[in-house]
């Protein structure tokens, strides 16, 4: 998996965790609600966006966790399979090259295919 993909997944995970963490500090909660009200009065669609993000954040966290679990289960066997496929392809290529070199050497010594 690419580092950039992991970085994007990590950033999304951090954002969703921050947005979904309930505030235990009453002052922070009041400021958050005041900000949401002020933003929703200034730009109604932005307030709706904040509400939607707060609503969907737990589901996004759950989906990211499941995605990470699935990817980790799929990537490991795929890496092992690619490693063995590469090894098999290398061995086959070596065998073919060896056979061709032997045939060329025999043809050279005997004077060709006769």
Swiss-Prot record:
The keyword DNA repair does not apply. Expressed by the venom gland. Keywords: Antimicrobial, Secreted, Signal. It is found in: Secreted. Residues 21-44 form a propeptide. GO terms for cellular component: extracellular region. The keyword Secreted applies. Residues 1-20 form the signal peptide. Transmembrane segments: none annotated. Belongs to the formicidae venom precursor-01 superfamily. May have antimicrobial properties, like most ant linear peptides. This is U-myrmeciitoxin(01)-Mg8a.
């Amino acid at each position: 998996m690419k580092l950039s993909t992991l970085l994007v997944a990590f950033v999304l995970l951090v954002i969703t965790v921050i947005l979904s963490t309930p505030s235990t500090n009453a002052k922070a909660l009041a400021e958050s609600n005041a900000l949401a009200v002020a933003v929703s009065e200034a730009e109604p669609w932005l307030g709706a966006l904040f509400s939607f993000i707060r609503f969907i954040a737990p589901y996004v966290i759950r989906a990211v966790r499941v995605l990470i679990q699935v990817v980790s289960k799929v990537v490991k066997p795929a890496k092992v399979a690619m490693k063995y496929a590469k090894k098999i392809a290398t061995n086959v290529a070596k065998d073919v090259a060896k056979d061709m070199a032997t045939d060329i050497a025999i043809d050279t010594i005997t004077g060709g295919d006769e």
